[in-house]
Amino acid sequence: MSEHDMQNTNPPLPPLPPEITQLLSGLDAAQWAWLSGYAWAKAGNGASAGLPALQTALPAAEPFSVTVLSASQTGNAKSVADKASDSLEAAGIQVRRAELKDYKAKNIADERRLLLVTSTQGEGEPPEEAVVLHKLLNGKKAPKLDKLQFAVLGLGDSSYPNFCRAGKDFDRRFEELGAKRLLERVDADLDFAAAADGWTGRIVARLKEEAAKNRATPAPQTTPPAGLQTAPDGRYCKADPFPAALLANQKITARQSDKDVRHIEIDLSGSDLHYLPGDALGVWFDNDPALVREILDLLGIDPATEIQAGGKTLPVASALLSHFELTQNTPAFVKGYAPFADDDELDRIAADNAVLQGFVQSTPIADVLHRFPAKLTAEQFAGLLRPLAPRLYSISSSQAEVGDEVHLTVGAVRFEHEGRARAGGASGFLADRLEEDGTVRVFVERNDGFRLPEDSRKPIVMIGSGTGVAPFRAFVQQRAAENAEGKNWLIFGNPHFARDFLYQTEWQQFAKDGFLHRYDFAWSRDQEEKIYVQDKIREQAEGLWQWLQEGAHIYVCGDAAKMAKDVEAALLDVIIGAGHLDEEGAEEYLDMLREEKRYQRDVY
């Protein structure tokens, strides 16, 4: 019988049901091969003819789900994303939750629904864990994202020029690559809780609508966890800090130094707080009482006047001392204050964003009041201020070495503005106003993106300038306490050897004991030609490349705006020169190190 005859004698086949078609569309080549054999055997004798069972079952219809990613520098974006994930799951929506440090950037092309919560660091750069994805989306190999629905929540600090820049960049680039917004982007300031909760509520409602359209079976309803502000094991946290005691405050720069750097030791006894090398300590502080008096005098406000702050009725002097930000100016403050001052010059400053940003960066709040006097009520003035926020300091000790203590390396911020002495809020509190045995409220902020290698035999290269050396003291303390076999190399820079060599005797002892195997120091002002850590990196190119071939992990800590960028440029030069790669290959190599967690940065 000819093929033509066979076609004519067989009755027409009915169309497959839609649900079967949907299942078949998800099969891979191996599954199709198995299924065709199985079907042929069943058609021939109603049995499988001894075909081996396929381990992979036919795929079920893909449930409605959403991927929630976070890119965090200090933990805020992570906590918001965790809370959003909990709310989505409580609404019956399946969630895939990941921090970007654990997410393969190329997987973005396979996502269908994506929520991203990201902070911004430095001069508008994405957090460290988001760098690889950011580069992919903005590079030549950026994937099409026309099947993606997304929403972005940006966290930032409006006192900086590039407010929420990372969130804006991701949001814009997703759209340019074809993705569709589930919600308009939200940019949240330091007091982000209300904005984040609003964004979460709207995205949950929107995704419930989308799930209904897809007729997906929702996941079981769950009860959202209570007390998200509290650590899971009940330890002290940002919202409930531990009242610790100051043990020591020692200046570790010379009297002639232009810098005032303090070694701070704090007692954690009784807190059950634990930290790892790479973590930060959050420090709550009180403003300078002299600054509070100065501001109230300038405004003509009685210190006993009562206002609402922190859910309480307090004298305005007490409220300004402990509840409001007084040392960091913001564009919002200047714009809000300008109508009260009724001054043409201040109005012009407030109206020009570029001029305003420069003014905010250079002019403290108190000096705005000096230059542009105004009369406000206590409530009006407080309404212009941001809530006081804790400061984070890299921990410079290992608990394996110091037990129930935690050590910090704090650069005291001091400057003059129009002849008036000014100081940083937290650094001034720690360096000048907190007395020995005095109480400081603290909490541990985890930094899982800045960790020693799990294999202690791996070599490490530590690159830092100024107080950026802090976590490396903790790293080497930890390696010494473990008697780790891995080699340690420190590249450190500061202005002067004799004045600014932080922890000099300790590094010498580590070298003597065999826990500091290589060291290079860049003293930028000790000779006519300035020498920086990036110069030492290029100088040691062959050695660095050799260590990388041995599996070394590279760590960078310090200033994001200048030092970290210069160091990265130097590392790329090393990879190009000693590694014999072109520029594109060097970039890809560095991205590979990032994804392998062998290139980690803690920059600010």
UniProtKB/Swiss-Prot annotation:
- The UniProt record lists the keyword Oxidoreductase: yes
Which stretches does the entry tag as region Disordered?
Answer: 212-231
Annotated GO CC locations: cytosol
Source organism's superkingdom? Bacteria
What does the record give as the reaction this protein catalyses?
A: hydrogen sulfide + 3 NADP(+) + 3 H2O = sulfite + 3 NADPH + 4 H(+)
Instruction: Please state what class of enzyme this protein is.
Output: oxidoreductase
Residues bound to FMN are 72-77, 119-122, 155-164
What residues does FAD bind to?
A: T327, Q361, R391, L392, Y393, S394, T409, V410, G411, G424, G425, A426, S427, Y604
Any one Gene Ontology biological process term?
A: sulfate assimilation
State how the cofactor is bound: Binds 1 FAD per subunit. Binds 1 FMN per subunit.
Q: Give the record's subunit note.
A: Alpha(8)-beta(8). The alpha component is a flavoprotein, the beta component is a hemoprotein.
What this protein is called in its record is Sulfite reductase [NADPH] flavoprotein alpha-component
Q: Which organism encodes this protein? A: Neisseria meningitidis serogroup C / serotype 2a (strain ATCC 700532 / DSM 15464 / FAM18)
Phylogenetic classification of the source organism: Bacteria, Pseudomonadati, Pseudomonadota, Betaproteobacteria, Neisseriales
